[in-house]
């Protein structure tokens, strides 16, 4: 087995939870970073940006405050349906562990403010 997880449904766990708990508010976060980085962000040797996906702006702001309180930077990744992408990132992150290649494990982080300043900095691919 190469470690790639099969997708059972065409949705995300965040969206499934929201559909099952209709009165609840779901904010998808912390699944793109390992537990040991959450416990001690200084291990990352730089700012750790944590994406948040939710349909509720107020709930997302409350969770963003929690992210900031532990020394990380919240990043608004959009509505809850974007948790699909975040969950796939989590799967990619787990591949070395699922293949029993712990020595090849890695972390990845979002870096904001890196886009070109305008359309002049972008060219079409040929």
Name these PLM-found stretches.
Residues 48-126:
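Active-site-lining helix/loop region of Rossmann-like oxidoreductase modules
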């Amino acid at each position: 087995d190469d470690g790639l997880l099969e997708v059972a449904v065409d949705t995300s766990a965040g969206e499934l939870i929201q559909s099952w708990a209709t009165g609840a508010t779901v904010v998808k976060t912390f699944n793109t970073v390992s537990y040991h980085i959450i416990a001690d962000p200084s291990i990352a040797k730089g700012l750790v940006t944590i994406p948040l996906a939710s349909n509720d702006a107020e709930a997302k702001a409350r969770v963003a405050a929690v992210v900031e309180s532990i020394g990380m930077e919240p990043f608004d990744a959009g509505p809850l349906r974007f948790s699909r992408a975040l969950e796939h990132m989590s799967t990619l992150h787990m591949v070395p562990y699922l293949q029993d290649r712990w020595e090849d494990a890695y972390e990845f982080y979002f870096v904001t403010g890196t886009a070109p300043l305008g359309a002049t900095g972008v060219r079409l691919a040929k």
